[in-house]
A protein has these predicted regions:
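An acidic, low-aromatic, low-complexity terminal/linker signal
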Residues: 1-179
Length: 179
């Protein structure tokens, strides 16, 4: 229990020091992507998955994770890259288990590179010239194995918003308060 508290304390200090942790990974290419570790629960090898009829095209299936049935999203396909081929044994595939808005899901990826700490000052918005339909929240440069690489930070919330239908309702009581 003390290890968990220590880990939480370390992550809390990062926020206070204007720093963040990024999980760096690849999507079957040499290019490096990242997501904020704050939302990551665990990284696992690709588990057995079941296909369900009528699921979204970016879902590879559902699996059982710690007693929960969760969707597994093909991140390559979700950000409009070629999907990871489920039969391709040359790609070491993993699943990043995340929690967003009290919803747990997995993102199928290629290889995990590492976890790095970086300063918010080193994070930049993506270039405006790439358009509004991209799935990037930011970009940064990170030293990976002695080489400075451009890392694209994926906007996981945007990916999820395209897959998961959110039921947004406003009660009459709240509407009355606004008037």
């Amino acid at each position: 229990m003390s290890e968990i508290l220590s880990s939480v304390d370390q992550r809390t200090k990062l926020v206070g020091e204007n720093r963040l942790e990024l999980l760096l990974f690849r999507l079957g290419t040499r290019h490096t992507y990242a997501i904020n570790v704050f939302k990551v629960k665990e990284v696992i090898t690709v588990p057995k998955m079941n296909m369900m009829p009528g699921i979204h095209g970016n879902l590879r299936g559902v699996t059982i994770y710690r007693g929960l049935t969760i969707p597994v999203i093909d991140l390559r396909q979700a950000i409009r890259m070629r999907p990871v081929n489920a039969d391709n044994t040359t790609i070491d595939r993993n699943v990043i288990i995340t929690e967003y808005n009290r919803s747990v899901q997995g993102f199928m990826i290629g290889d995990v590179v590492s976890i790095v700490n970086t300063s918010w000052e080193d994070i930049q918005p993506p270039p405006k010239s790439i358009g509004k339909t991209n799935f990037l929240t930011a970009i940064t440069q990170i030293d990976i194995q002695g080489k400075r690489e451009l890392v694209e930070i994926i906007d996981v919330e945007k990916v999820l918003a395209e897959i998961i239908e959110y039921d947004v309702t406003i009660s009459a009581e709240i509407l009355d308060q606004a008037v």
